[in-house]
Amino acid sequence: MPRHAHLLSALLLVAVPALPALAADRITGQPFATRSEVHAPHAMAATSHPLATQIALDTMKAGGSAVDAAIAANAALGLMEPTGNGIGGDLFAIVWDPKTKRLYGYDGSGRSPHSLTLAEFQRRGLTDIPSHGPLPVTVPGAVDGWFALHGRFGKRAMAENLAPTIRYAREGHPVHEVIAYYWDRSVPRLGKWPGFTEQFTIDGRAPRNGETWRNPNLANTLQAIADGGRDAFYKGDIARTIGDYFAANDGFLSYEDLAAHTGNWVEPVSTTYRGVELWELPPSGQGIAALQILNLLEPYDLESYGFGSPEHVHLFVEAKKLAFADRARWYADPAFHPAPVERLISKDYARERGALISMDTALREVQPGTPKQLDEGDTIYLTTADADGMMVSLIQSNYRGMGSGMAPPGLGFILQDRGEQFVLREDHPNGYAPGKRPFHTIIPAFATKDGEPWLSFGVMGGAMQPQGHVQILINMLDFGMNLQEAGDAPRIQHDGSTEPTGQNTAMTDGGEVDLETGFPYETVRALMQKGHSVRFSHGPYGGYQAIMKNPHGGWTGASESRKDGQAAGY
């Protein structure tokens, strides 16, 4: 650990009092700031922006389904929070349909350009795919996802769902604090890419907190989609503009790549934990890491250890290390490298891997398991629920903040840089190939009890996402927190595991444990004695939204303070 990190830890050991002392001045009994859950009898929405939440509610009040509301809110977030998402990115969703009483999963991720080969990266002397510019760009799948979800579950016309965002894009809306912060950080990194400064700055700078932002180009693009449907984006003038732009700027994404795009309906997969069944989408995303971590934690009595105890943090971190070793080895596009999903999320496999966990010593090096096939496999998150009982868990992203920085002229959005997550090796499951989906970090979550819907939730934020999913559930199921407290509680994030992107070498030092402010000094000392390298950092620790089915009727919502968001209902 760097010397300054040791000094910071030492200072915090003195400055941070124990949990019981902190709890004394809060009526909730919790040692951290929180607020009330939100309850409503008919419908609920929770998003990372208050205006998007209101748009979702207005959509359902006008007769739209939870899917209509999710699409309307996602469109709004693409305008209002371009630091995390937009129609240049991908989309994943899980929908609970009250008519069929089952879950439906959608993988709306795009593929790499067919004309960009591994040999081209090698010709350029690259060992990693750049974070920005034309090379990491993959086909954006979000708009396709909207229309796929709408075609199965929508009630209102797509034009009605997009109308509020089109109006805000033309007339303007005030930029919120967290978004302004990340926007300001993005401008110096992305300003050199063609079209970014012209379309995403005000006189060369980011819009400030409270300042009005307009995006008439995006309004025109959304209007074209509203009028022409899905094909207006993938097979019309929008696709031609994108193809021409990349051809003129050393890029490879083409009209043909966009025209060939298809998303996929997929079956969610699950595991059980303390009487609850957690559902995630299968790879190429990382959702099953949350299932693996829960399976590894299940044998331990976390409730008796208590939230924030050394045992709680240690066990969570060790389980994460084991799951993420498999994540680096197995998670990839199943069309190219199918993962042994059923085995990876099985209880038997968790028992085998769990034998590596010691209560006394932190693992420093973790190899992936060798699961054999069983006989016979920056981001925004939002959730909505309607009066009919439909629930939507939806996540959408540009990948790294504002994406690649590549902003085709006149369109008002930025293309994602998801291709950065490929490995430039043929022998790796996540190795680059034309027409392939990269490993994905964005994952929606859903939980059921006794076959009935219970909780739609998500925690955006890269590798934090499966770690966040697990922490929300154990906060509720093991530590007795309510829906809002579960998201507001201080978080743990372990960094340093081997990555499926190939950008981290194999972990040999145990990685680093980042703790958000609020963990007691006794815990920090005990973790360090076990061999953990502990840091207190500003994060990010993700962004949480959730809706729970209220057992007394109606809905309960939550939205945490780490984002600009809001949960509201009617």
What are these regions (language model features)?
Residues M1-S9:
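Bacterial N-terminal signal peptides that target proteins for export
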Residues S9-P20:
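Bacterial N-terminal signal peptides
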Residues A24-Q54, A66-G228, F233-K235, A239-G285, ...:
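Noncatalytic scaffold domains of N-terminal-nucleophile
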Residues T59-M60, D144-R152, G228-K235, R240, ...:
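Alpha-helical support elements that line or immediately flank enzyme active sites
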Residues L79-T83, G89-Y104, F252-S254, M390-L455, ...:
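Active-site rim segments in enzyme catalytic domains, especially the processed small/beta chain
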Residues W265, E376-T379, H440-I442:
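Short, small/polar residue-rich loop motifs at catalytic or cofactor-binding pockets
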Residues P299-N398, G410-L411, R418, H538:
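Internal maturation/activation junctions in enzymes
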Residues D388, K436, H469, D478-G539:
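Extended C-terminal subregions enriched in glycine
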